[in-house]
Amino acid sequence: MNLKDKNIIITAGGTGGHIYPALAVAEMLRENNANVTWVGTPNSMEANIVPEYFNMQYIKSSGVRGKGLKRKVAFPFTLISSTLKARKILKKLKIDLVIGFGGYVSGPICLAAVQKDIPIIIHEQNAKIGLTNRILAKLATKVCLAFDVEDIQKRLSPKQLAKTQVVGNPIRKDIIALNNKTKNITENGKLKLLVLGGSQGAKSINNIIPDLIIEANKQGISLKVWHQTGKLSFEETKNNYNQVPSTHIKDISAYITDMTNAYEWADILICRAGALTVSESAIAGVPAIFIPLPSAVDDHQFFNAQNMVKNNAGFCIRQDQMTLENLIDIIKPLYEDRDKLKEISQKAKNTLIKDSSEQILKAVEQILNKK
């Protein structure tokens, strides 16, 4: 379908887990000639990323969950104000459809769309549905889920389930391309370990990896590491690697700019279990040891990881159980049996949906055809 003259708003913000899947869909909509505008909040992650690619409008928005009394008292007034601003944006741009990818900013713009009888699609990236999306699911024309999990189904009414579709997480085309390539697991010698401490860093993961390299080597397990530390932990982590022989280090950096290259290089991955990381690593076929962030809302990272574990396509260790012994217990059998590693890699590739953006595009077409 040619979406020429169709005006669509994408709204997502707060974290990369919301923003990057939304960007993948926004790019596909633009390829199909839609006029795409992004609505986010000022002084935010999306404000730093999105304007390079799309026209952006701003509204002030904030959450209420877990906040102090002052924020909770102010929340209704902030919501009313931001919804009124959102209504003006919808009218000015003559919007035909709104797609919300979560984050607080999705609330006001989607509520305003409902008030103006503009259809909305929401997409939930995690295996636990977020508060904003849980509310919007009652109002949405279409509810798209990344994971087919019983917990989300329990939280939705039969009416909401009738308009729900599992579509996976939209990810970048260059990473999807890895799914169609044979994953080259190192046949012998050093196992290539990619460590993602997160863009902001994960101190517990960063601290244990240098010791893991040394202890594994003592047990006859030779690892070569490429470590993203995050900005906050870079200097400390780099210093910790002074005890590790340079032959076991590919690179230590605050941030990896070319994740496609990193996934293609890696034999195995240690990382958090944010929705984007789980989806990208699976599609790329990189067997992962997930260390869920303990403070994640509703423990959603643990449940994200379980989608891989239950399919024998990944591993999960709680942070308080992340010991050298437990890590080596997972890595050693894979080091000794590379065919097993290849098997897990293939299972990871086959676990998640690969054409998520296309499925959302099809939903957009179906809704706009009915208008």
Swiss-Prot record:
| Segment forming the signal sequence | none
Cellular component terms, GO, for this chain's entry?
plasma membrane
The protein's matches in Gene3D superfamilies, at most eight in alphabetical order, are given as: Glycogen Phosphorylase B
Annotated disulfide bonds: none
User: Which SUPFAM superfamilies does its entry note?
Assistant: UDP-Glycosyltransferase/glycogen phosphorylase (SSF53756)
> Which key words are in the record?
Cell cycle, Cell division, Cell inner membrane, Cell membrane, Cell shape, Cell wall biogenesis/degradation, Glycosyltransferase, Membrane, Peptidoglycan synthesis, Transferase
> What does it catalyze?
di-trans,octa-cis-undecaprenyl diphospho-N-acetyl-alpha-D-muramoyl-L-alanyl-D-glutamyl-meso-2,6-diaminopimeloyl-D-alanyl-D-alanine + UDP-N-acetyl-alpha-D-glucosamine = di-trans,octa-cis-undecaprenyl diphospho-[N-acetyl-alpha-D-glucosaminyl-(1->4)]-N-acetyl-alpha-D-muramoyl-L-alanyl-D-glutamyl-meso-2,6-diaminopimeloyl-D-alanyl-D-alanine + UDP + H(+)
What are the binding positions for UDP-N-acetyl-alpha-D-glucosamine in this chain?
T15, G16, G17, N126, R172, S199, I256, A275, L276, T277, V278, S279, E280, Q301
| InterPro entries for this protein | GlcNAc_MurG (IPR006009), Glyco_trans_28_C (IPR007235), GlycoTrans_28_N (IPR004276)
Establish whether keyword Transferase is in the entry.
yes
GO MF terms here are:
UDP-N-acetyl-D-glucosamine:N-acetylmuramoyl-L-alanyl-D-glutamyl-meso-2,6-diaminopimelyl-D-alanyl-D-alanine-diphosphoundecaprenol 4-beta-N-acetylglucosaminlytransferase activity; undecaprenyldiphospho-muramoylpentapeptide beta-N-acetylglucosaminyltransferase activity
What superkingdom heads the lineage? Bacteria
Q: Could you tell me the EC number(s) of this protein? A: 2.4.1.227
A Pfam family (short name) is Glyco_tran_28_C
First-listed, main subcellular location of the protein, grouped into a coarse class: membrane
Q: Its annotated pathway?
A: Cell wall biogenesis; peptidoglycan biosynthesis
Q: Which family does it belong to?
A: Belongs to the glycosyltransferase 28 family. MurG subfamily.
Relate the protein's function as given in its record.
Answer: Cell wall formation. Catalyzes the transfer of a GlcNAc subunit on undecaprenyl-pyrophosphoryl-MurNAc-pentapeptide (lipid intermediate I) to form undecaprenyl-pyrophosphoryl-MurNAc-(pentapeptide)GlcNAc (lipid intermediate II).
What's the protein here called? UDP-N-acetylglucosamine--N-acetylmuramyl-(pentapeptide) pyrophosphoryl-undecaprenol N-acetylglucosamine transferase
Q: Which organism is it from?
A: Francisella philomiragia subsp. philomiragia (strain ATCC 25017 / CCUG 19701 / FSC 153 / O#319-036)
